Amino acid sequence: MSNNQTLFERAQRTIPGGVNSPVRAFRSVGGTPRFVARAQGAYFWDADGKRYIDYIGSWGPMIVGHVHPDVLAAVQHVLADGFSFGAPTEAEIEIAEEICKLVPSIEQVRMVSSGTEATMSALRLARGFTGRSRIVKFEGCYHGHADSLLVKAGSGLLTFGNPTSAGVPADVAKHTTVLEYNNVAALEEAFAAFGGEIAAVIVEPVAGNMNLVRGTPEFLNALRALTAKHGAVLIFDEVMCGFRVALGGAQQHYGITPDLTCLGKVIGGGMPAAAFGGRGDIMSHLAPLGGVYQAGTLSGNPVAVAAGLATLRLIQAPGFHDALADKTRRLADSLAAEARAAGVPFSADAIGGMFGLYFTEQVPASFADVTKSDIERFNRFFHLMLDAGVYFAPSAYEAGFVSSAHDDATLDATLDAARRAFAALRA
């Protein structure tokens, strides 16, 4: 029995399903999860000592690779001064200033510890600001595991075939309206029917939790126009795509200004950190200034802030995002070319440092399109690549991530493995 198998069996005795986040269990793809022993750059090593090229990067945060020396030094520097204080620090101000500088739509920002906290708090704030209850989200978009957002959500729920979680009260779900992603007509109909009831529309401008699906400019511009017309708050959930699609996030890429933005992953540099922020007149409704309560013992944790601040400074290097986008596009286009050469139905897309792999002929534009993917063939591909030392997301419903640490050698090795995998899929 391998060390991975031994650890998984041991974990299942004390941890539900043996994991602390469902997608890690390999339930969709089958087999034994890889237990990570260490990581460096674009690689990690499992409990059996096998090395993998990592295209998950902790589900997005590791944009500069694992254990970047500058991030490591920043964390080591603050550790001797204390791990957590429950009181303000200068570093909190520094990271807030950095976020506001990089994302101009954010005039004020509040730090939290997870993406779920960020989206949950942003929605509460939008409801408090507008005095309305209804929220609008989109099918297949995942915004964390708050009750009102686990209605036709994406990510891990799709992996397990359950679009809506058990345990979500009907009285909570009734305030959530779910529309089709990229469907402008459905959006216009919803606002015509009950626009005056809508507190907020929350959207992933680049969805990464039903695999990678881009918002169309027409769709996102319609969102901005309709929310402004009806007095609803437009919330961009950029927990995944923030600082990764572009330095200023998807809102910079599309040239659209939301009212509130949720951030995470990259801003923690691998540590538990997230944030939400936006217009000052909305943010002023948060306690202690206003009546919308939000708090957190570990919000603005000094160790997490140090890692995040170091990462944000690294990604401002000239040409960083151009280089990241180029290598991610090369990966996606080359994988698609290898599949075509092998006669395997397949498509791929990339934007910034995110990519999507689909066992369909066309790149999807909605949740319905994503569900047409050949899941069985994806699962076979996943294991062929895993055996070759390439670690893609263990689900057909997750985006992948490239870091600045991925170089030509890692991309070449990935494509060599993919060539063999696609040939095996054709056989």
From Swiss-Prot:
Enzyme Commission code(s) on record: 5.4.3.8
Biological-process GO terms, alphabetical: protoporphyrinogen IX biosynthetic process
GO cellular component: cytoplasm
PROSITE patterns: AA_TRANSFER_CLASS_3
GO MF, any single term: glutamate-1-semialdehyde 2,1-aminomutase activity
Record keywords, A-Z: Cytoplasm, Isomerase, Porphyrin biosynthesis, Pyridoxal phosphate
Key word 4Fe-4S present: no
Top-level taxon of origin: Bacteria
Reactions performed catalytically: (S)-4-amino-5-oxopentanoate = 5-aminolevulinate
Cell location: Cytoplasm
Enzyme class per UniProt: isomerase
Main location: cytoplasm
Modified positions (N6-(pyridoxal phosphate)lysine) in chain numbering: K265
CDD domains in the cross-refs: OAT_like
Pfam families: Aminotran_3
Pathway: Porphyrin-containing compound metabolism; protoporphyrin-IX biosynthesis; 5-aminolevulinate from L-glutamyl-tRNA(Glu): step 2/2
Cofactor(s) needed: pyridoxal 5'-phosphate
First and last residue of the signal peptide: none
Gene3D superfamilies with a match to the protein in the record: Aspartate Aminotransferase, domain 1, Type I PLP-dependent aspartate aminotransferase-like (Major domain)
Keyword Cytoplasm: yes
Recorded family membership: Belongs to the class-III pyridoxal-phosphate-dependent aminotransferase family. HemL subfamily.
Subunit record text: Homodimer.
PANTHER family: GLUTAMATE-1-SEMIALDEHYDE 2,1-AMINOMUTASE (PTHR43713), GLUTAMATE-1-SEMIALDEHYDE 2,1-AMINOMUTASE 1, CHLOROPLASTIC-RELATED (PTHR43713:SF3)
HAMAP family noted in UniProt: HemL_aminotrans_3
Name by which UniProt lists this protein: Glutamate-1-semialdehyde 2,1-aminomutase
Organism: Burkholderia pseudomallei (strain 668)
